Amino acid sequence: MTERVKLTGASRRDKLLLWLKESTLPLTGGQLAKQANVSRQVIVQDISLLKAKNEPIIATSQGYVYIDSTGQQQAAEKIVACLHGPERTEEELQLIVDEGVTVKDVIIEHPVYGDLTASLRVGTRKEVQHFMKKINSTNASYLSQLTNGVHLHTLTASDEHRIQQACQALEAAGILITD
């Protein structure tokens, strides 16, 4: 049986960067902690230090992602305004991803803090299910509950037509704000 060696600060952060860069999927703090043989809290601190050094790491509902600016970019991006209650969140996300569109984030305008943005990066029904499961299991509130259901999403897709189709689906469902 092999015993995992606990990595020290700088070497652990180097490994974290390597693991994140090599991964095609988000990695959770728990997964990274297990690989590095440290607590999840140590990983959270390490990620904060890496972000402070301008490493393009984002935290999503599925885990940490390294955003490689040299990687493939989506050809089309659009910010859309939506309005609905919490009970329609899953429907909204599924309408979008069913058109081959990724929901990059959610943005609300807070009266004190200004724009608050949370990364979502949800692009498939499976990712929608994972997001919903996480919201429900943690009893977390949606950001849009702070603004009576009004919120923005940044949508990305391989082409503008997919985003137009998603917008039409949202409008037909009475979710898209058009005025």
Residue ranges and their predicted role:
Residues 57-68:
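Minor-groove-contacting beta-hairpin "wing" of winged helix-turn-helix DNA-binding domains
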Residues 26-59:
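N-terminal helix-turn-helix
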Residues 74-179:
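Mid-protein regulatory/catalytic core that forms ligand/cofactor-binding pockets
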Residues 7, 20, 37, 83-84, ...:
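Residue-level marker of alpha-helix boundaries and capping positions
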Residues 14, 18, 45-48, 94, ...:
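Solvent-exposed alpha-helical segments within well-ordered globular domains of core cellular machineries
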Residues 30, 60-61, 106, 145:
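Residue-level detector of family-conserved "landmark" positions at structurally sensitive sites
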Residues 1-34:
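Extreme N-terminal segment that seeds HTH/winged-HTH DNA-binding domains in transcriptional regulators
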